[in-house]
Regions:
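A short, conserved alpha-helix in the catalytic core of glycosyltransferases
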Residues: 144-146, 150-155, 160-187
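Short, well-formed alpha-helical segments that are part of the catalytic scaffolds
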Residues: 1-11
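A recurrent flexible, glycine/aromatic-enriched loop bordering the glycosyltransferase active site
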Residues: 125-146, 213
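Non-catalytic, C-terminal membrane-associated alpha-helical segments of glycosyltransferases
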Residues: 99, 196-260
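Short beta-strand-to-loop acidic/aromatic patch adjacent to the donor-nucleotide binding site
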Residues: 69-80
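Glycine-rich, basic loop-to-helix element that forms the pyrophosphate-binding segment
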Residues: 47-67
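Conserved donor NDP-sugar-binding/catalytic core segment of glycosyltransferases
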Residues: 80-116
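A conserved acidic beta->alpha catalytic loop
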Residues: 6, 24-33
Length: 260
């Protein structure tokens, strides 16, 4: 609800008509009813409870694409936009003739530090907005603006992925087609960072629970990981990371010791 409130507070955007699509993947906490009451114009796409983030986004985008919009904007429901963020992102896209993907950086409301966006291709660190468009790598799907021109080249998110991985895959597909990933000039809003250490690689949990978590759609499903790595890096690297991910799950404390 808060996410939608922030979106609608800056609509309409000058020169554009906007439609919002939201996937209801079997929600039982009353969100659908609340949205329908407060924002009846939102187009709700129904799921079966097994879509998770990526497949939910894929289904909503598929529905939206049937209308044929000039731009498509992904926004996570835990991302709260600053005033003018959408209009400024559209201007950034037009600045590069709508041939790049515009990614918005988010920051923690508590600390002001960067939480999601694009990374420096050399260092792997999150890029910090500096008032100019910056080319980066490894997009996060919190705020992503895709023009019709780019969509016609890349299409939708890959529904092979349940939850995570789809945004990473989309960014890599773009780079392989020489479509630039550009960080918007300023922070577009706030989003708090998720738990740093996932359950599947957290030594505080027993192996059985870690293994179950690893193979859940919200974990690091091995088949999806292999699919992603094989597509973009080839079989040798895919096989290597398949094995090391299993070892990471089985011996997480060793990984932590090596990292430090």
């Amino acid at each position: 609800m808060k996410c939608l409130e922030h979106i609608y507070s800056q609509l309409p955007v000058n020169g554009f008509t906007t439609d919002i699509f939201m996937t209801d993947d079997g929600c039982t906490d009353g969100t659908r009813e609340a949205v329908t009451t407060a924002f009846p114009q939102v187009r709700i796409v129904n799921g079966d409870g097994n879509l998770f983030w990526n497949r939910g986004m894929h289904k909503a985008w598929q529905e939206a694409a049937s209308t044929g919009y000039d731009y498509y904007l992904w926004i996570n429901d835990d991302t709260f936009l600053y005033d003018g963020a959408i209009e400024q992102a559209l201007l950034s896209s037009r600045e590069c003739s709508d041939t790049a993907i515009i990614v918005g950086a988010t920051q923690s409301e508590a600390t002001g530090k960067s939480t999601y966006g694009l990374r420096d291709a050399k260092t792997g660190k999150l890029l910090v907005p500096n008032g100019m468009l910056q080319e980066g790598h490894g997009l996060n799907g919190n705020f992503v603006l895709v023009s019709k021109i780019v969509f016609e080249q890349l299409g939708n998110l890959d529904s092979h992925f349940h939850h995570s991985g789809g945004d990473t895959d989309y960014g890599l597909r773009a780079e392989e087609r020489n479509i630039r990933l550009l960080l918007h000039k300023e922070y577009i809003g706030t989003c708090e960072q998720h738990q740093a250490l996932s359950k599947w690689c957290n030594p505080d949990y027993p192996l059985r629970e870690r293994w179950q978590s690893l193979n859940k759609p919200t974990g690091m499903p091995l088949k999806e990981l292999f699919y992603l790595e094989r597509r973009h890096y080839g079989y040798p690297k895919a096989c290597f990371h398949f094995v090391t991910t299993i070892l990471h799950c089985c011996f997480p404390k060793l990984w932590i010791d090596i990292k430090h």
